[in-house]
Amino acid sequence: MASKIETLKANLEAALGARVVSLTEAIGELTLVVKASDYLEVAKTLRDDPKLRFEQLIDLCGVDYQTFGDGAYDGPRFAAVSHLLSVTNNWRLRLRAFAPDDDLPIVASLVDIWTSANWYEREAFDLYGIVFEGHPDLRRILTDYGFIGHPFRKDFPVSGYVEMRYDPEEKRVVYQPVTIEPREITPRVIREDRYGGLKH
């Protein structure tokens, strides 16, 4: 008798066919990778196919693969990753679609399929700059209105570009260039034989 994960894998391959870029199993979960051009249609199939029935989107996030594998990775930089649940069949799936353009990452919005994707996609847009085409209200959700850049990108400086402070003369919050100097954080190594200045 086939296990649940084997059954799901067979159902996915049968329903999606050539649209599957890769389908891998790790830690008891399947990860399905599809092209950005197929992302929306695949999501509809995952929800509507009677042998799949992924009724619920649990989570959606962006990922920046710029330094993945110690920089050895040379594939697309940004991906949208969705975690889906089939309440009917009691199985889960991770769906990943890589944006083909690193300079302007665009993937389709899943809001029309799972309304719970709304704020998740806004968050991924705000933090990674991934544009979700067809989203009804794609604007920042976590950072300030005038924020420049996308803070979860690997090339975004830890200290940021601007800082805000209250100006008592203007009686309002103002933005100014960051006054913190960027620095390399190196962990402190404690040698046991000289710990605390004591010689053992």
Curated annotation (Swiss-Prot):
InterPro entries: NADH_DH_suC, NADH_quin_OxRdtase_su_C/D-like, NADH_UbQ_OxRdtase_30kDa_su, NADH_UbQ_OxRdtase_CS. It catalyses: a quinone + NADH + 5 H(+)(in) = a quinol + NAD(+) + 4 H(+)(out). GO terms for cellular component: plasma membrane. PANTHER family: NADH DEHYDROGENASE [UBIQUINONE] IRON-SULFUR PROTEIN 3, MITOCHONDRIAL, NADH DEHYDROGENASE UBIQUINONE IRON-SULFUR PROTEIN 3. It is a peripheral membrane protein. NDH-1 is composed of 14 different subunits. Subunits NuoB, C, D, E, F, and G constitute the peripheral sector of the complex. Keywords: Cell inner membrane, Cell membrane, Membrane, NAD, Quinone, Translocase, Transport, Ubiquinone. Belongs to the complex I 30 kDa subunit family. This is NADH-quinone oxidoreductase subunit C. Its EC number is 7.1.1.-. Gene3D superfamilies: NADH:ubiquinone oxidoreductase, 30kDa subunit. Coiled coil: none annotated. One of its GO terms (molecular function) is NADH:ubiquinone reductase (non-electrogenic) activity. It is found in: Cell inner membrane. Transmembrane segments: none annotated. It is an enzyme of class 7 (translocase). NDH-1 shuttles electrons from NADH, via FMN and iron-sulfur (Fe-S) centers, to quinones in the respiratory chain. The immediate electron acceptor for the enzyme in this species is believed to be ubiquinone. Couples the redox reaction to proton translocation (for every two electrons transferred, four hydrogen ions are translocated across the cytoplasmic membrane), and thus conserves the redox energy in a proton gradient. NCBIfam families: NuoC_fam, PRK06074.1-1.
